[in-house]
Design a protein with these regions (language model features):
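Conserved alpha-helix/loop element of class I SAM-dependent methyltransferases that forms part
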Residues: 40-58
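Conserved class I S-adenosyl-L-methionine
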Residues: 57-66, 159-184
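Conserved SAM-binding motif I beta-strand of class I
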Residues: 83-88
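A short glycine-rich, Lys/Arg-flanked "PGG" loop and its adjoining helix->strand segment in the class I
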Residues: 75-79, 142-157
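A short acidic, Gly/Pro-enriched loop at the edge of an enzyme's catalytic core
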Residues: 119-129
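Core SAM-dependent methyltransferase catalytic element
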Residues: 189, 195-216, 224, 243
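A short SAM/SAH-binding and catalytic strip from SAM-dependent methyltransferases
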Residues: 127-141
Length: 243
């Protein structure tokens, strides 16, 4: 009579894989956790980059860069005359980003270990700030993005991509922000909603620009928005709480 394989033996391949991750370094394990195994299928990174209309020579911040999923795609888009600031508050991830930039020869990528309340971008500013799957992690988002305005150059933009209620796993663990919350918070931080792209199945993809108002003036609610097809709409205004 053949003995049945133990549960331990059945699990050995998984344990070996876990051990490999551990031996390869904590940052690599985090990177795999952030990016998943099939992210390209649902994140559509090439279409995201194309939608942002980045020009050679642009300066771009990848806010919450993580393992560099978008960082080096952005670096290719801005070219040698441009610059990408890979911003993260996790030292493990910034060290990983620095190693990757060196290995890839990406001289147009600067890595920034930021503070939780300030991305610490250069005073010279950027043309675009892209934040992907990071918005829901930021505390005091209105004050955070109000502070970030100083880093945007004239005609600068912020692109926010975050999980929404359609993402089942992320919704279960509240790793998401409803679209209407993002719009309301960004308006309160001093931005107008410029455009929306709807080709991402799990995420909202929203573009904002700073409102131009006189010093000391109160920012008006309900700034004009435009969807991907160019049709105007207005953000919903409602009372809410978000943990």
């Amino acid at each position: 009579m053949k003995s049945q394989p133990s549960k331990f033996h059945a699990c050995r391949p998984k344990l070996a894989l876990l051990a490999l991750f551990i031996l390869s370094g904590c940052a690599t394990l985090k990177q795999c956790a952030y990016e998943g195994l099939s992210r390209d299928e649902w994140q559509k990174p090439d279409r995201v980059i194309q939608s942002l209309q980045i020009r050679p020579g642009n300066y771009v911040a990848d806010l919450g860069a993580g393992g560099g999923y978008f960082t080096f795609r952005l670096a290719a888009a801005v070219g040698s005359a441009g610059k990408v600031y890979a911003v993260d508050i996790d030292p493990d991830m910034t060290q990983l980003l620095e190693r990757q930039a060196k290995q890839k020869g990406a001289g147009n990528v600067d890595v920034i270990l930021a503070k939780p309340d300030d991305p610490l971008l250069p005073a010279s500013g950027v043309d675009l700030i892209l934040t992907v799957n990071t918005y829901h992690h930021i505390s005091s988002r209105v004050s955070y993005f109000a502070n970030v305005r100083k880093y945007l150059r004239p005609n600068g933009r912020i692109a926010v991509i975050d999980f929404d209620r359609r993402a089942w796993i992320e919704g279960l663990f509240r790793h998401y922000t409803p679209r209407e919350f993002i719009i309301r918070e960004m308006e309160n931080a001093g931005y107008s909603f410029q455009r929306e792209f709807d080709f991402l199945d799990r995420q909202s993809f929203l573009i904002f620009a700073p409102l131009k108002v006189a010093a000391g003036a109160r920012l008006p609610p309900g700034a004009l928005q435009r969807r991907e097809d160019g049709s105007p709409t207005r953000a919903p205004h409602r009372s809410y709480e978000m943990s």
